[in-house]
Amino acid sequence: MKPIQVGLLGIGTVGSGTFNVLKRNQPEIQRRAGRGIAITMVADLDTARAQAVVGDAARVVSDARAVIANPEIDIVVELIGGYGIAKALVMEAIAAGKHVVTANKALLAVHGTEIFAAAREKGVVVAFEAAVAGGIPIIKSLREGLTANRIEWIAGIVNGTTNFILSEMRDKGLDFDAVLKQAQALGYAEADPTFDIEGVDAAHKTTLMSAIAFGIPVQFDGAYVEGITRLQAADITYAEQLGYRIKLLGITRRQPTGIELRVHPTLIPMKRLIANVEGPMNAVMVHGDAVGTTLYYGKGAGSEATASAVIADLVDITRLHTALPNHRVPHLAFQPDELATTPILPMDQVISSFYLRLQVADQTGVLARITGILAGHDISIDALLQRESAEGEAQTDVIILTHDTVEGKMNKAIAQMQALPTVLAPIVRIRKEELN
């Protein structure tokens, strides 16, 4: 049988990994797919680099549209990234009747509804396992492996850059800026790391998982996004003393009135497996009503780890190449006409427990005023830690862990405490999740 012919748009880190793994493991992959899969055309602006990777195994061009226009190409793999030209090329590939594989979480989180609708209309597949958590097969697990379950919540470390930074801040006692420079030197962080450190990348991925888990359209514009740039080494140390680790988590949870969709630094009990995910590794916890809590762990990025997910999608499409469109697994797990209109909850309606760090004047009565404000907003205290002041020191840190409360109440309490003349610096607030 004639091999499935693949056109590759972009042959950087992931593209070269995809070509190399497919070439190296071709016999195994063919036995699993039931048919050969061959990358026969590659588009990259750096044609010399591309030619050095593929040799004479594929035709190299500088114009991506030449790949899409080639009637011999069955599947287009988009590895360019971003929202602009990548969206145009994906839509053109769909219009040309090509299946699409992409690792572009930003594109799908923002434009997924439009892209999936176009794919349904043309009877083609848009596959995106590589868009979330690199080599971890979390999309397939949510869409197929857990299909018997009512998913209750997902909590994931889905950005390796921020997890590396937080791990190093804890282990070496360094502040954020110093560790960011180290991460950039080691290649774990981009020259412009904004999407990573501000939580945007994790929010793109969490948006996609939320849509699949709860059968809703992708709604990135409803996500709450907070990064790690304001975290200090002191907060990580205090959290450890209280039995917690701080991780940047993507969280989505089913509630009676809507869906939580949020990314922010989070205190997690040290005893949880996910609290012990270190360096650039990723992990995703999923809680289903039948299966309970499951954990998926592995490399969230890297050439061959992400290529593993890209090729898994190529194999899936090869297997269903002759299947009727209505016999395929839906893009977002639920049938398109069964997607719910459940809203994303505003952040001030979300219930969390909190870590608060207040830098206060070392005076009598300060603590009583702070606890009185919390009590006035029906916020109860779970634990309290006060740093011993050095002799002659006029200020100290007060650390408070609260029980669950509504975010809106906490916002009002923080504003009231911040106005006290004895509170000497902006109050640090980090949400806490037990992940039971």
Predicted regions and their residues:
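N-terminal glycine-/serine-/threonine-rich beta1-alpha1-beta2 phosphate-ribose binding loop
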Residues: 1-96
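General beta-strand structural signal in soluble alpha/beta enzymes
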Residues: 60-62, 69, 77-78, 101-103, ...
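Rossmann-fold NAD(P)-binding glycine/threonine-rich loop
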Residues: 85-96, 105-143
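A short hydrophobic/small-residue beta-strand
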Residues: 99-101, 381
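Rossmann-like NAD(P)H-binding beta-loop-alpha module
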Residues: 120-201, 208
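Substrate-binding/catalytic subdomain of NAD(P)-dependent oxidoreductase enzymes
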Residues: 178-276, 281-283, 302
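Low-complexity, glycine/alanine/valine/leucine- and proline-rich hydrophobic stretches
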Residues: 264-289, 303-304, 375-393
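A conserved regulatory-domain signal marking ACT and ACT-like small-molecule sensing domains
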Residues: 309, 314, 318-436
